[in-house]
Amino acid sequence: MVANFHIHDAEKYRVYEKGFFPILKKHGGSFHTVDDNSETLEGDDKREGRIVIFQFPNEEAARAWWADPDYQALSEHRRAGTQMKFLQLIHGMPPRG
């Protein structure tokens, strides 16, 4: 998963941030990175704001996280405190072997 958003109410976003990790873990997710100063090296679609990257073991786990009533309730704080540019499900490559 890759998300890009602008935080306009840090207090509301902090409520979301505190509850995010337990729900992520509940669905087998892992957090990779956050960057408030990413740099576009090529292309016209410059990304500004916060970029967050996290993953799940499979698509089913990602969709279960998204549909989880606990997450949906928590996400109201993110919606109130940020302007979401995108939250994108990226399909991973199949195992090689």
Segments from the language model and where they lie:
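C-terminal structural segments of small proteins and small subunits
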Residues: 62-63, 70-83
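A short linear hydrophobic-aromatic micro-motif
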Residues: 30-32, 74-75, 86-89
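C-terminal end-helix/capping segment
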Residues: 79-97
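Short S/T/G/P-rich N-terminal loop/turn motif that feeds into the first structured element of a domain
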Residues: 1-69, 91-97
